[in-house]
């Protein structure tokens, strides 16, 4: 790490470590392919979970559609067999059933194609993880980095940029653009105070949401009820009561207290000053629904709430965070000199360093017993190698790059690291 000036500025003083920038130790790549694969799986849960969940959803949707159509057609054939219709009516109805069968065949083919594409995506991701090896670790990590960047872009709604990067890098099967587009439509609708898209999403994922004991749909229904009450007309109150009977009554067995709280708004106006009910009419409730949807969406697909880029950056910053990195005098080489990195590192503990690692401000090389630190008269510290090279080029003169102080090489004092 770099050393700032000593507090008293004397040449015989051993320097402080206040201007520290920690140099991370090099990562040692294990030669065991199985160990690498196992460790990768721990970090790549959502890479496999997302397409697999989408694949299961498509299969269930196609199966339900198939059963519904077949049931209708079989019932139609049964009615024809038991009826005494004329020949023309029978032929006409049979023609309609044949048309429905042809339509069913087309839907099955389309559904099969979609299933095959999603199965291909699952296989591509398994193959990607299985390809981890010492020989291609650099290329594999490069692909992983692009996946992480695409994940960040998608979460920030940069869909066009994410698509272009994915296509140019040939990683379309390794990213989830369509899933995030689906989520973006729901989020935009909620921001526009519309719940239809969110309710459709809940219906499409009803089984899984019920299994996870989600109450997101209940919250959406409550918000629709509140919006009807907000209108504050006799007709809107009537609609609100009808809506509650149709869509909220079934939630009473599990969420009675919340339901009673919201239903009590029938006795209040949206302009009420009663804090208990005023909060229900606040527009920020829509922001709460957006946040709740994001949580349910990530939970459904096994995604992290934070972008993967943030998580990996925090993992690195946890090894670099020092008290000096948060000071104004922090050198620009320290990542924590950047405000965005400081925000990411804020909840992280300081790095525990048992031994100091000093990095020369001039050469950026490590200072150790082979290249010991030297203290200038002004208290600033640099490596012996860098100072020797400077002295050779300037007739034995040393110029401090941070203060401009000029001194002779003979005035330097060797520092010792404890």
Curated annotation (Swiss-Prot):
GO MF assignments: ubiquitin protein ligase activity; zinc ion binding
Start-end of RING-Gid-type zinc fingers: 330-403
Domain LisH: 141-173
Cellular component terms (Gene Ontology): cytoplasm
Keyword Phosphoprotein on entry: no
Domain CTLH: from-to ranges: 179-236
Domain of life: Eukaryota
SUPFAM superfamilies: RING/U-box
Keyword Ribonucleoprotein: no
Record localization: Cytoplasm
Protein name in UniProt: Protein MAEA homolog
Name of the coding gene: MAEA
